[in-house]
Amino acid sequence: MSKRFTLSGAILALALATVSTGPASAADLSMQANDGFQDIHFLSPDGKIQRGKRCAVPNPGADEVAAVKKQVDAWIAENGIIPDANINIPVRFHVVYKVSRGVTTGNIPQSWITNQISVLNAAYAGTGFSFTLASTDRTQNNTWFTGCYTTSREKQMKQALTIDPAHNLNIYTCSPSGGILGWAYFPNSYAESSYWHGVVLLYNSLPGGSAAPYNLGDTATHEVGHYLGLYHTFQGGCTSPGDSVSDTPYEASAAFGCPAGRDTCSSAGQDPIYNFMDYTDDACMYQFTSGQVSRMQTMVATYKPSL
């Protein structure tokens, strides 16, 4: 289940000024994501994925990208270094499930959660980030379970369940509408103590789930990457600054499956299809670059210093 992963080769006022004060609605998110969320739908709640959306995190606009760069550069200039911290992040797992006509859906076994933490630690080995399961709670709420992708339900769920988000990674499992596999908010999106922070996952994308080919636990790896400040590898397409990381080749659009040799931009390097921040199958992705590691470290130092 775990893999060997390799590394290739803030001010709050500004943060709040560059983003909205609350998340967009599901419809708004779809409109913002001009790179195309993947079109994934499920045959059934426990069926294989046919078509729909891989990740519900919209690409940030050019103004937000520039504002974040300015703030991160200011942190580095003030401190004189690129941070290289070892940070162990406590994980608070919130399992939301439903019971309908005597049938329980989404109350995942503890072994899936334990294995998910192992997958995260394998994926982030060498990045300076590690993860420890601090608690698991379980909540039966049919409305939250199926409505967690709507802004009002997400807000209710997180306000009720979140645990000290400045010092913990809160992960929620549910069954988002529209076949969404997961989402998170960038570190600059809100104050580090905001209940909005955390990761929301389709419950059966965890290791042991049935959402093949996205059921080895790397939806969580991908969304935690966003939580720590990474953009998609195809952010900006073939145009500078791309994903704001110098050692990930430009990529015109998201890759699916595992298309070896794919090369969609004229600049050097084939598409980074093995990178955790693309949209390929879980079995295909296995790496972060050293530039992405520096990006996560500086984003956390700038926007999540209490983590």
Residue ranges: model-predicted function:
Residues 1-10:
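Bacterial N-terminal signal peptides that target proteins for export
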Residues 9-19:
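Bacterial N-terminal signal peptides
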Residues 21-26:
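Sec/Tat signal peptide C-region and signal peptidase I cleavage site
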Residues 27-168, 174-177:
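Propeptide-to-catalytic entry region of secreted or membrane-anchored zinc metalloproteases
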Residues 52-61, 147-149, 237-239, 257-259, ...:
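Sequence contexts marking disulfide-bonded cysteines in secreted/extracellular proteins
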Residues 248-307:
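Metalloprotease/metallohydrolase-associated module, dominated by Zn2+-dependent proteases
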